[in-house]
UniProtKB/Swiss-Prot annotation:
Transmembrane segments: none annotated. It comes from the Bacteria. Belongs to the UPF0473 family. InterPro entries: UPF0473. This is UPF0473 protein Lreu_0536.
Length: 98
């Protein structure tokens, strides 16, 4: 997925079919163990919902070095680490605590 624009915590993702979807950034973090940056996002239309579909991606410079791409996390151990980071920011009811 390519990360098109980042405007005040808002990100437009473009899928392989050219469809755009607006997401809100929850937070980003860096991992020294993996040497990568990560981002948690959720669909903007879910902002006021009781629950949201949080997605996590690796932030990587794109091949043209003119922007960034969001890359799926495919390694199970890496995914466990990312999930653990997210869980430190969720309360017992699954609500985000900043």
């Amino acid at each position: 997925m390519s990360k098109q624009e980042n405007n005040e915590d808002m990100i437009t993702l473009i899928d392989e079919n050219g469809n755009e979807q607006l997401f809100k950034e929850l937070f980003t973090f860096d991992s020294d163990d993996y040497g990568k940056s990560y981002i948690f996002i959720y669909p903007a239309e879910q902002e006021n919902d009781d629950s949201v579909d949080i997605q996590a991606y690796i932030i990587a410079d794109n091949e043209d070095n003119d922007g960034q791409d969001l890359v799926p996390i495919e390694d199970d151990k890496e995914w466990d680490m990312v999930e653990e980071v997210l869980n430190t920011f969720l309360d017992n009811d699954g609500n985000f605590k900043a």
